[in-house]
A protein has these predicted regions:
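Cross-family detector of peptidyl-prolyl cis-trans isomerase
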Residues: 1-125
């Protein structure tokens, strides 16, 4: 079961703490439809201005000032921008996300022990 892509780029981009819907690759999913049951939380890395300039030149993209600031100060995964549906953001609790990131995983990159989100709050901005 999939849901249609809702890619709103560059308004929503892959800065640290964003929730995005997982999906299969472009070859088998050119519409970029999202999984209805799987998601990921962006952790990523910090980027320098030179690294972002290089990405722009090599990939023919342009980062907004907001994106540049976020990728340099917060980190993220800019190579995923415009390719996945982003639907939320962690506004507090990134320490818990960091723990999840470093959890032991199996050969399929799934946690050896299930991880459950016991509580969350939806905040409208």
């Amino acid at each position: 079961y999939t849901i249609p892509a809702e890619i709103v780029y560059p308004k929503y981009f892959h800065k640290r703490g964003m929730f995005a819907a997982a999906r299969t690759g472009d070859d088998e999913n050119p519409e970029r439809a999202s999984s209805a049951t799987q998601f990921y939380i962006v952790t990523g890395k910090f980027f320098t201005e030179m690294e972002l300039d290089k990405m722009e030149k090599e990939q023919g993209i342009t980062f907004t000032p907001k994106q540049r600031q976020a990728y340099m100060l917060e980190g993220g995964t800019p190579h995923l921008d415009g390719k996945y549906t982003i639907f939320g953001e962690v506004v507090s609790g990134m320490k818990a996300v960091d723990k999840i990131q470093f959890t032991e995983t199996n050969a399929d990159d799934r946690p050896v022990k299930n991880i459950k989100i016991k509580s969350m709050k939806i905040v409208n901005k």
